[in-house]
């Protein structure tokens, strides 16, 4: 099944939270399962930073949630009707910096406006309106997707029954913002970046590859890397190149990333992570969080090096103090932050129960 596309905000532009407007927004989306007659089994999936509209494939390819989704699995396509879309600012079909600006006939590049999570959620809401979905059984997201799910619960508190937030906090930490800054600088200082207007020339591949390598280290754990590589070396490794196997692994991940992601989208979405503030548009964070009516599942991985346990615990406190019906779980995983994508055994029950409201 191929990705579906729809153009939204073609008559009335989207007013962005930080100023500016966007019109004629293409949204790439995918659906799985069947919407029942009562229309009460719809679930919205919000993807993480570099995800897309296709968490699952039925033709042998690997989606980013391939092992979690399907008939009888945690994301049960026999039970639920899933909707997943690429986020605003992305590069997998939905309008972003690499898209053609209808006013100029050229890619937006440096002219793409600054976006925040609230803008992403507005586009998702417009998609559901287009699809005729007026209520959701649940919204689920991990990492950056968890921030989207959280904002949905604030901005549209009557729209869903359940929220499932995996490995994501209410605020991004100073350390995590620091990681993102280093990654952005790697891209911006690539000689080919050209202020973001590189589409008619050579893209900033070296900078983006380096940024991805650093990002990978924040998604993994020392224990996992030690088990996989230890201090093993490559027989053909150069002294100043990929001498250790872990270096070769990171180089491979950096190069592989270039095949599927745009540098400008990476910069914009990293900044949206940094900037996430659920109180934007409200007087304070407690006023914002107190709007939440959905049953809320929050899952923390104690070995997560990006959204650390202390950040999830602070989020737990804020949600509880705001009167949210919170169900909090934490456990270790060798996979660290990426556990929500790969550690099915640990997450299966929490996802099943969270979607069902059990």
Swiss-Prot record:
Keywords: Acyltransferase, Amino-acid biosynthesis, Cytoplasm, Methionine biosynthesis, Transferase
Pfam family, one: Abhydrolase_1
Entry-linked Gene3D superfamilies: 1.10.1740.110, alpha/beta hydrolase
Effect of residue 306 to R: Can no longer use acetyl-CoA as acyl donor, but can use succinyl-CoA
Span of the signal peptide: none
Subcellular localization: Cytoplasm
Family matches, as InterPro entries: AB_hydrolase_1, AB_hydrolase_fold, HAT_MetX-like
Gene Ontology CC, one term: cytoplasm
Reactions this protein catalyses: L-homoserine + acetyl-CoA = O-acetyl-L-homoserine + CoA
HAMAP family hit by this protein: MetX_acyltransf
Subunit details: Homodimer.
Recorded family membership: Belongs to the AB hydrolase superfamily. MetX family.
Record's protein name: Homoserine O-acetyltransferase
Organism name: Haemophilus influenzae (strain ATCC 51907 / DSM 11121 / KW20 / Rd)
Gene field: metXA
